[in-house]
Amino acid sequence: GTVNSHQAVAVYTQKLDGVSAKKAYFFDEKAVYLLGCSINSTSPYSVATTVNVCRRNGLIEKGDSWVWHDGIGYKGESLRVSTGIRTGDWGVVSGGITSPAPFSAELFAIGIEHGIRPENASYKVVILPGATPEQTKNFQPKILFNNNDIQAVKFSDGNIGAVFHTSGRLGNFETKKPGVFILSSDEIF
């Protein structure tokens, strides 16, 4: 990954249990971008991407491509929300470090379903911490690329966060190797 004084970019390439994916995360002062592409699976089980799981707190508002809960907005296509009481045991969660301590809580979960054996599935989600429902609805993300070669977004200040999975070019910037970059008008991080 890479970082400047107010933005960060991280990348994760998954190859686990028959599921492969390229995932990139872009952080700035207003939003967190989650991009996933090249999602493939040979597993007989359904594949999903979890965006957030937390205790439910109050109302949930939804639109065609947005969800808002507890001061956090989510923008993206095919977002799936589930709520309900879940039961667990902190003793199991901690790996046996603590004594058994059963608990129940109403949870809010949001994610994307990719189905069984997806081929080249992808997703684009933006998380908006501190946003109102109206701000969430009206937010216009600037996602430049989300493909096997490059994942890139334009941040609110005009800087560009980019993950190159291969050599490539973005505007006047060119890299001969895979890399993670933040591009501004006068600096490269």
Where does each model-flagged region fall?
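Extended polysaccharide-engagement surfaces of secreted carbohydrate-active enzymes
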Residues: 1-189
